[in-house]
């Protein structure tokens, strides 16, 4: 059996245009080998995880022009924004914006025309995107099958993340943009698709929110006309200063949202137990909320009733 010819070292983990394969000494038969994938027409890749957004975008750069940029939900994903599941699905079509009158047409790509002067940025991974605030406004037009309430929660959750920064391994990344940049982007968006919902989401975004579920919880309280909780309130405890997810300092009531990671990690579960006990010993009433509470109407109503009683 003839040994498979190795790829050039610089393509061992990357992508290339089939039209330029000959320049790299890659034959047509080599391009049909099992170790190469076809992420897009006219492109071959090796060693890339095409289910990963960043690596799929790197493969697409092979055919993109210098002035093009990732836009809409693709850009938001590259900035680490928490998107509804259907927008972050592996192998989902990439949104690519092109300045001027034309737009990119290719299987696996949704092309868009960008206005001249659309602000651009480099993502944390060095990929060219429209500015995160602009991508957020574009995302408002991507309704898919989301209801009005679901889309509003998604927009606010993304906005909270962009102006706060993601928390990873205990540290918080720098915010992708400022509240003022978000406001300016909405003004620039004008009366485009989703303008009314963007204005509402703009009024509801808050700095300091750590997760989309915390956003969902906060908006649940907003819809129920419960007083708005404080974000980022520091409580002195025997463990030192602790910051609950949401707090009502005047009533010494706080809310902690606990996702599955809190339950599945034994060390974290024990830490949560001590954290709650420290809050209680400091004289605070602690309400612990999980995903089931937000998904079930009866439990939602019970949570709201409990809060109203405590805040009365």
Q: How does the language model describe each region?
A:
Residues 1-193, 312:
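Short gly/ser-rich loop at a beta-strand->alpha-helix junction or flexible surface loop bordering the NTP-binding
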